[in-house]
Amino acid sequence: MTDNNTALKKAGLRVTLPRLKILEVLQEPDNHHVSAEDLYKRLIDMGEEIGLATVYRVLNQFDDAGIVTRHNFEGGKSVFELTQQHHHDHLICLDCGKVIEFSDDSIEARQGEIAAKHGIRLTNHSLYLYGHCAEGDCREDEHAHEGK
């Protein structure tokens, strides 16, 4: 818990119970790409009485402070993940919402080459690749990966 207190203070945020609980949930292995609604449901399951409006407000504060990264994947629903030190890209299944993080040096190099060719010095980029799960029929378990 002390690390979370320090992280909040370092980001310029007061340490409050809702912020600590939301940060705790975001650190769970199954919550790498979670929507505000799914995070709220998880808090309810934990017996926490934190309102949905508070969850949205805290996530926006975390986004502004650089604690989380907001992704707007296909379908219009924002999902959040803890900001990571290493860059990664995403594969997203359009059927079940499953999100796979990956890194590929050759893709990164090629993007840099393309930017240089057009006279652009890259400072940041996002790569989202959309498709359908190749193994099995993920539509049977449509909501298994939502927000993750």
Curated annotation (Swiss-Prot):
The gene is fur. CDD domains: Fur_like. Its main location: cytoplasm. Zn(2+) binds at residues 33, 81, 90, 93, 96, 101. This is Ferric uptake regulation protein. Homodimer. One of its GO terms (cellular component) is cytosol. GO terms for biological process: negative regulation of DNA-templated transcription; negative regulation of siderophore biosynthetic process. Residues 1-84 are annotated as: DNA-binding. It comes from Shigella flexneri.
